[in-house]
């Protein structure tokens, strides 16, 4: 053990310090330091901690947990990172791309340079748009619309027709585009670039209008904030591009672009030169280092006097002091003293090259100044004065040119070019930019002078001598009879044509099989005829000579061995029609033999098979075989940048995105390097890895089920718009956050914990600084946010994928168009253009100048049409156009209630309303008739009158206490009514969502009545005839009904014509209510009536898009309907319960569609359910999926009804089946004929003939004389849902859709079979009346019977007859009797007979 003395106290520290050994305080300070370091972004490492060794290292547990909270989420391998995220609702509209214009009814106005249709302006000059690229897999071209140019084959016709009209159909035109370049368009390999930056160019091309794919916005950098509010909007708003440079593809240089509007406002707003320049061009461009502002201040502006120019104003000026052109550094010298420049070739003597860098050059003026003599000083002042005079002369010249241009009112350049060069090489021609007759937008370039650009091979020139055309040994000139050899001439004196034909046929039949040569080969025919000529037309001798001499080698016919043929086919399969590499691949045959063999071989069956054309030819052959059964309209897939996946059965499983590797997408788009059409066709023919003769050769290490390369909709959107490829979200996030791990984790945490789906947490400015497209950043943030949901609930990914695929149908329909066959054939287009021009000339001659006349209005009506939509907005009912009413004055007569319009101010127009000579109020309207303001007196009067009118209306399932929705007293759209004009009553409609009730109320107030021909076209409806020529002059030519397509019978008075659109129908086919006795007394064609779409236009209560929701047929050719060339007419539409429209015949034939009101045949119910039910079926005529398809009665094929009507040999009829009395089916009973039967419409396609099979078939327009037509019977008794109100029916419809059920038959025939008794009209054969107290023998009226004394009234039979005439079913009678006491109907007949007060004889 050690001794006690060995233990010593510890040595005292030399420099004592106050040390705190309290661990709790040290830990607290350490935590604070860590928190401060984390906030400042500094990295804290435990290894560098300055805590004492005896102190435990501590950290903030909460902070540590937050940093690694989503560690498992980031490293989870079961959840993918490349799925297509669901876009928030606010971003879906901007995600649409690949938009295709509908040019069916589009027109082009050459004066306004605009493309428009009936609804809006589609394109105008100077619009910046996307255009499909070539090849289609590349990003969209970005360009500006310069103008519209007629196609070359129609340019002469259109140029002559411009004198009469400036509007033409769009299909005869193309669009001239001025392109903007992306960085990748200029340089091949660009790794990092700003996706929103483009470069202007002078490159222009003429392109088809159909290449349009959407609109974008391109601004100069200086003009961005004139349109957008801030810099952030420029980054986050889609389809925004900007530029500040121009790239010229000829000089291969970049130029700086200035906005003429900006330089006018910033540099000198009083300069006439800049004013005219701004009027002529939108932008000017110069070389990057060209001091344009200084040049203009010195040589153009007058703000600074010439004498006030300082030496600093000469330092930047590089004009040559001799020639006054701009000097380039490598071609000039600069004075070391004053900075004046001079060209090397302008010096005396000229210099070949610049001196070395250590050589200093001084100009002659500075040398004279250095001499200090009086003469040198005088010369210096003279040269300085000459320089100042030159500047004054330049300013004066430019000012004169500018003033002249202003006086001549020089405007924008006619070529619509945005850019004008005003750079280095235009320094001496600045004023020429204002010359209206000169146009030189391209950059100038000087002549290249010098040793580098000159040819030195002309030092030892030999005097040139012309080579004689005639050779020394030849006496005749080439081309004469002595220098040419005769191949064949027919001498009729030596041989006849018959003998010649026999000789040629003998050579073909005997020699060609031996040589294996076709008899039509040119070389064979030439040699045979040449031998005949050589033997002096002796056919026998010539045949022997041919048989003896001819061979394949002699005829230069290609002879390939089996090995050479195999190598040839392999080369063609590999290189296609590029025959030079084919020749090199074969190796043993010259190019001439390869070419001859290829053009004989490619049309053979083997050639077609190897080239992949055999299947295409067979397909075309099948198309020609069934051409007689096809309609005149064919459907095409018009988007070349995407795949027609409807024709690909493996579309969902065979494609894979080449950028993000996802395997699902609602649409697949082409990409360069991906699959093409031939590869996809081979895949569809042979399967995935099946080996056949024409299948693609898979590599030795090919994977099973290899995918076809394409782009998904997400990658295609970013690639087409911004030319960027998709990047994984974590990689995108690391680019934004940098190398800081804490920032990376914080960004992920912020993205996941953000609850607002429309808010993004990442900074747009950081993304812009890192050259990342904001749409890519949005996609990355959405993937991270939605991946967390998939991570927590893996089943949600299946729902997300299914939801994404639901957009396929909508996107596919946007890329499908229906065209008439041969519509774009040159001859057809030329004929259409000529017809259009002729019709336009006739219209101009036929339309007289109409002068408005004041209408006489004697009724106390309000001349204001109000649609009360919201408390603060009141609009007029004229929906077809915006009306202008500038400086309109209508003076009122003494006692007439015509409004007096005066201009109260520049903004409002005051309408004074007078009644009985005294003022009853006023109305203030703005010039655009968008807002109406009533004074209190007028408002109260309107309110009281509306209450009175509303109380008179029937109550349609709505309480009378509800507010009034729409008010229509009289049309404001036509205040200047012509005398004897066609006036229409505008019914006040109570608050009701039943569209059929609204249309019915209108027709009740506007029953058919007599109308003049000039009043048959309304002026302010959207559903206008497309030809301005009034088509009613040929009313007699309209021979068929638009519903049933049956011809009208002249003996029947059934035809009714719409006064606006010309719709011709049987009144019972369209469910038109006619007043009593109108049909007998008047001709229905001469009376006014409006169809439902035209009625809706007068007062829109439902959709104004009049297109059937059940079929693809579109009303596209009114002119040919009027010319009776085709069976095309305006659509006979009825409204649906959803506020859309449907063809009446489409709803009639579809058994699942019911009517809310069978008598009016509307509204159509269950249309959505029908569309869902038929979405997987295809029409046999138009080949379009879905719609209101109806199955053929004889087979399983389905068709759209309108497609069947427009096709030949299709039969649409009613099938009548006679039934027994004890039937369990709902049937119709005709009392007069004592007939019981069922009705149903049937479709028989063109593959079958009509066979009765015990049933009777009737046309759709069949109408018995005594009762309702068959179409009315079927709609009333089989299509009507009369047991419920419309609100209940819509509720049941939505309920069935929610549960995926289809509408069933409403008739419970097994329990309560219904028998519907037809009403019929009796007409007395003696007097013709149809009204009588009692009918004798069912045909003789009571009056005629009394005159004749034929019969006496039998009360027993009469009562029985009356009961039969009632025609009410038993169950309905019982319902009517509910709540009524039977005792009230007990009448004592004897007492009644003795009562004097009630007996007729006592009166």
From Swiss-Prot:
Catalytic activity, as annotated: S-ubiquitinyl-[E2 ubiquitin-conjugating enzyme]-L-cysteine + [acceptor protein]-L-lysine = [E2 ubiquitin-conjugating enzyme]-L-cysteine + N(6)-ubiquitinyl-[acceptor protein]-L-lysine
Where do the zinc-finger regions (PHD-type) map? 317-369, 1038-1097, 1177-1231
| Major subcellular location class | cytoplasm
Zinc finger map (RING-type):
1041-1095
Q: Which InterPro entries match?
A: BAH_dom (IPR001025), BAH_sf (IPR043151), EPHD (IPR034732), Homeodomain-like_sf (IPR009057), SANT/Myb (IPR001005), SANT_dom (IPR017884), Snt2 (IPR029617), Znf_FYVE_PHD (IPR011011)
Could you tell me where the Polar residues compositional bias lies?
45-62
Q: Where is the SANT domain?
A: 555-606
Q: Where in the cell is it found?
A: Cytoplasm; Nucleus
UniProt keyword terms in alphabetical order: Cytoplasm, Metal-binding, Nucleus, Repeat, Transcription, Transcription regulation, Transferase, Ubl conjugation pathway, Zinc, Zinc-finger
The annotated region (Disordered) lies at 40-62
Q: EC number(s) in its UniProt entry?
A: 2.3.2.27
Coiled-coil stretches:
none
Q: What does this protein do?
A: Transcriptional regulator that, together with ECM5, recruits histone deacetylase RPD3 to a small number of promoters of stress-response genes in response to oxidative stress. Probable ubiquitin-protein ligase involved in the degradation-related ubiquitination of histones. Contributes to the post-translational regulation of histone protein levels by polyubiquitination of excess histones for subsequent degradation.
Any idea what this protein is called?
Answer: E3 ubiquitin-protein ligase SNT2
The record lists the lineage as: Eukaryota, Fungi, Dikarya, Ascomycota, Saccharomycotina
